[in-house]
Amino acid sequence: MSRFKLTLEYDGSNYAGWQRQAKLHTIQGALEQAIFRFSGQQLTITTAGRTDAGVHATGQVAHVDFIKNWPPHTVRDALNALLRQQSEAISILNVENVPDDFDARFSAIKRHYLFKILNRRSPPALNAKRVWWIPKPLNAQAMHEAAQKLVGQHDFTTFRSAHCQAKSPIRTLERLDIQKEGEEIFIYAKARSFLHHQIRSFAGSLMEVGIGRWTAQDLEAALHAKDRKRCGVVAPPSGLYLTKVEY
């Protein structure tokens, strides 16, 4: 068996998330279909991050084991051709051989996410499924300053889904920066791992700061409350991107 590491991007708008589900269109299902057509093997592809329905990726990482040691460029080009035939919004950016002990999920040491907000009065006509449109003016500087209250090791119970299956709500957030570029506001997050809906919960709560409804102290109080009910609105998946995985 030969293990291959795949780096890929996808538009998650029309998928029911990464994880294979019966009768639903998923990223994993589409990839495994292409892999079967290429290799004749019924294989399971393992990913660094099982993104939710509607979430995108520009730097997702996965691994798969083939019986044959194909040249990496052959795997990339063949899978991309098959994905195009299947009309999938998925592209394999890079393929490389890796040792058998490499695991796309468990070998990862950092995950980077980006959340995009379109902040203008007019709604988006072109990228409606790739941003969170907020027509009210946002104070990006206030959002950035408040976000620093969340950086570090904390119990993030307030900012995780009630359905989160993680054993512990404690995570170490290494970066949470907010930058404004023209009509867009970008939220950059980095950690070894994240809780279910954590970044979308951050984005929704920071929106409350941006419109002036919350202060930085309100955000900090919500964090320390360790109470899901204290979270702001959960932002939609359309603005969220997995951008990079470090190993």
Curated annotation (Swiss-Prot):
Source organism, top-level taxon: Bacteria
EC number(s) stated in the UniProt entry for this protein: 5.4.99.12
Subunit structure of this chain's protein: Homodimer.
GO molecular function, one term: RNA binding
Active site as annotated: 52 (nucleophile)
Organism annotation: Bartonella tribocorum (strain CIP 105476 / IBS 506)
A biological-process GO annotation: tRNA pseudouridine synthesis
Protein name (Swiss-Prot/TrEMBL): tRNA pseudouridine synthase A
